[in-house]
C-alpha cells in the first residue's frame, strides 16, 4: 500500500494539469532526478504557478491532497508527506511547502516550532503576526484538523517561560483588518505603552498586561500609528526602549514592518555560521512570501545589506534548489532587476 501511494505521489509531479494550462511536459531518463522525474522541468513549471494554480493542483490530485471534512482546505496524506519530504530532501522542503495549502503549511510549522521549544518561539510570533486574521484563523483550523488539538491549548501547555502569555494571546488573536483608526485610542495606547516601558523591568515587559493587550488585539494599521505617535511624542523609537533580545521586538517588527523583519531573518539564514533553525528560514521565507510581499522584502534586503537578495541566494544555495528560490524572488521584481 505504501509503495503504491508513493508511486502515485511521485508520478503526479510528472503531470501537466490541463486546468493550469501549462504546455511544458516532464520527460523521463536515467540521468534525471528522483524516481525518473525531470527535476528541472518540474521546478520550471511549479515556480510559475500562482495561488489559483496551486489550488487547482491540490484539487486535481486527490491521491495526495484530501479535502478536509470540516474546513475548506486540502491536506496532505501523512504517509505521503513523509515520503515526499524524503524524496525531495535535496530541495529542503521547498517543493513540498510550495504545493501545500497555506493553512496546512502554517499549522505544521507551528507544530514544529512547539516541539523545538524556546529556540523556535520566534517562528510562532512570525506565523501569528505576519498573516492576516483570516489566514491565522485558517491555520488554527488546519491545526485542529491535523492534530485533534488546538494551537491555543498546545501553546498554553507547552510554553513554560515568560513568553507564554504573549504567545497564547498572539495565536488566539483575530484582529480588525480594516483601514479605519481612532486618533484618541492611538494616543491612549501610546501613553500606556510608554508608561509600562518606563516603569517596568525591561526583561519582564513581555508579561505586562497592557503591552500584551495592545500588541495582541489592536489592528496592524492602528499599531503602526501608535509606533509613529510614540516616536513623535517621546522623540525615540519604541524598539530602542525594549530589551535587545526581547520577543516584543520581533512582534512589533512582524506586525508593523514585515519586510524589515524578513530581511533580518534572511540575513541570518544566509550566514556561514547559521544554525539549523536559521538555515530553514531561507526556504520558509521565500516560499511563504513569494505571493505576498517578496518585492518589498527583496528591496528592503538590498537597502539594508547592499546586496541583491537573488545574488545572495546564488552565493549560498546549490543546484535546482537554488534556481527554484532565485526564480521565486526574481518573478516578484520588475523586469530588469536583479
Task: Cite the ranges covered by each PLM segment.
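Structural signature for extended repeat/solenoid scaffolds and their inter-repeat hinge/linker regions
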Residues: 2-9, 13-338
Amino acid at each position: 500500500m505504501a509503495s503504491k501511494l508513493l508511486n502515485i505521489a511521485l508520478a503526479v509531479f510528472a503531470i501537466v494539469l490541463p486546468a493550469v494550462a501549462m504546455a511544458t511536459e516532464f520527460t523521463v531518463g536515467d540521468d534525471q532526478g528522483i524516481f525518473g522525474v525531470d527535476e528541472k522541468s518540474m521546478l520550471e513549471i511549479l515556480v510559475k504557478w500562482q495561488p489559483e494554480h496551486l489550488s487547482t493542483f491540490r484539487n486535481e490530485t486527490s491521491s495526495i491532497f484530501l479535502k478536509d471534512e470540516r474546513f475548506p482546505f486540502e491536506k496532505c496524506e501523512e504517509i505521503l508527506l513523509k515520503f515526499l519530504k524524503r524524496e525531495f530532501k535535496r530541495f529542503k522542503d521547498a517543493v513540498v511547502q510550495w504545493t501545500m495549502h497555506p493553512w496546512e503549511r502554517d499549522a505544521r510549522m507551528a507544530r514544529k516550532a512547539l516541539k523545538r521549544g524556546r529556540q523556535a518561539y520566534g517562528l510562532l510570533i512570525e506565523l501569528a503576526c505576519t498573516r492576516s486574521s483570516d489566514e491565522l484563523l485558517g491555520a488554527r483550523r488546519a491545526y485542529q484538523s491535523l492534530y485533534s488539538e488546538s494551537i491555543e491549548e498546545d501553546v498554553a501547555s507547552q510554553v513554560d517561560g515568560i513568553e507564554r502569555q504573549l504567545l497564547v494571546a498572539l495565536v488566539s488573536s483575530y484582529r480588525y483588518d480594516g483601514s479605519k483608526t481612532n486618533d484618541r485610542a492611538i494616543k491612549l495606547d501610546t501613553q500606556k505603552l510608554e508608561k509600562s516601558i518606563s516603569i517596568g523591568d525591561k526583561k519582564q515587559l513581555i508579561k505586562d498586561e497592557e503591552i500584551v493587550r495592545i500588541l495582541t488585539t489592536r489592528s496592524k494599521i492602528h499599531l503602526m500609528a501608535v509606533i509613529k505617535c510614540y516616536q513623535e511624542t517621546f522623540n525615540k523609537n519604541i524598539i530602542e526602549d525594549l530589551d535587545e533580545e526581547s520577543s516584543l521586538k520581533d512582534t512589533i517588527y512582524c506586525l508593523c514592518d514585515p519586510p524589515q523583519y524578513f530581511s533580518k531573518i534572511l540575513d541570518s539564514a544566509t550566514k556561514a555560521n547559521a544554525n539549523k533553525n536559521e538555515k530553514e528560514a531561507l526556504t520558509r521565507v521565500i516560499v511563504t512570501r513569494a505571493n505576498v510581499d517578496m518585492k518589498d522584502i527583496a528591496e528592503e534586503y538590498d537597502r539594508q545589506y547592499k546586496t541583491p537578495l537573488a545574488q545572495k541566494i546564488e552565493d549560498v544555495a546549490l543546484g535546482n534548489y537554488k534556481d527554484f528560490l532565485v526564480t521565486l524572488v526574481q518573478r516578484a521584481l520588475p523586469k530588469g532587476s536583479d
